[in-house]
Amino acid sequence: MAVKIGINGFGRIGRNVFRAALKNDNVEVVAINDLTDANMLAHLLKYDSVHGKLDAEVVVDGSNLVVNGKTIEISAERDPAQLSWGKQGVEIVVESTGFFTKRADAAKHLEAGAKKVIISAPASDEDITIVMGVNEDKYDAANHNVISNASCTTNCLAPFAKVLNDKFGLKRGMMTTVHSYTNDQQILDLPHKDYRRARAAAENIIPTSTGAAKAVSLVLPELKGKLNGGAMRVPTPNVSLVDLVAELDKEVTVEDVNNALKEAAEGDLKGILGYSEEPLVSGDYNGNINSSTIDALSTMVMEGNMVKVISWYDNESGYSNRVVDLAQYIAAKGL
């Protein structure tokens, strides 16, 4: 029986979670809370500038959405504690507004009747942060009720950082994410708390911060203090990459590194980590649902133990599919 999902915040991630859930018989979205009216939500769900038209029938019935004949209840409540998740049968809430990332705030969904909350962002004071393929085995149904799915960039970096550490020992590393612009930037020059994100997103390469590298230690404690990095926001609407330069404990060749990553991609991390030896560009990964896809042609080794690994990720589709995978995993392990 499919686990019942409620989505709070029907933006880029919320809608992509919905799209991913439509293709998964083990999860069912039954309710959405967003301050936008149902007609606009239906329009933005059906037509997407990045991912194309949704292959589903989407209509509005009063204040609700009907997708492929199934009714999804729509509400517009600002206070999560006042939602009707319990009455609607919602078991897991995907908290994707970007506003309720503190545990105390996200836990209001539990007051409203949900059994678990997945925050689709890095969080604070969460019960656990999980990156699928890396540490989902740490989930404890009795004690973990507010769960962070980390960031899209941590979901890209952590799987291959784990492989490098397990195989060769990762002494330290610096990463840069070359990241498509997101809604936390201005489309034209306008005020923002980050002076650089205040500049026109589609006209500039914008250096900014990311907590993704340090956050890896939340799912791989053995790498605490060993990774750091930053971000370059670039004028593309979707698909990003992580460029990791790391010092290993062992001396390796390019072939050693690529073989280890390929083995993981075809084995334990299949469906999470991809591996490509084709000369591809960002647009080729639009719609790719892996968390991370190694660009094997870009792997480099210098002086035996310094390596450079580049991995691509669709920062919308890949991440949203992991949110759905996590919901399915939680339901299987116990609510």
Curated annotation (Swiss-Prot):
PROSITE patterns: GAPDH
Main location: cytoplasm
GO MF term list: glyceraldehyde-3-phosphate dehydrogenase (NAD+) (phosphorylating) activity; NAD binding; NADP binding
Annotated localization: Cytoplasm
Pathway annotation: Carbohydrate degradation; glycolysis; pyruvate from D-glyceraldehyde 3-phosphate: step 1/5
TM helices/strands, residue ranges: none
Active-site residues, record numbering mapped to chain: 152 (nucleophile)
The family this protein is said to belong to: Belongs to the glyceraldehyde-3-phosphate dehydrogenase family.
Name the UniProt record assigns to this protein: Glyceraldehyde-3-phosphate dehydrogenase
Source species: Priestia megaterium (strain DSM 319 / IMG 1521)
Gene name for this UniProt entry: gap
